[in-house]
Amino acid sequence: MVPFFVQIKCKLGQSYAVANALAEAEIASEIYSTAGDYDLLVKFYVDNDTDIGHFINEKVQVLPGIQDTHTIITFKAFGAR
């Protein structure tokens, strides 16, 4: 499995609706509300052969209330168990 993170900027007043939609879709491992330029930080895992760009385009960016996304590809988790 390949982990990656997506920062999500929501339309005004839509952060909780977007977070709930992600949770209901059962595609995210973890969902956090954040302060700063983005409203949510979401951790995903996909199979090694999954096209991450296509996954984000087809499963994440189509959710109502999302204004912008920023994807973070990770390499190694330190201290992971």
Where are these regions (language model features)?
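A compositional/biophysical signature of low hydrophobicity enriched in polar/charged and small residues
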Residues: 1-81
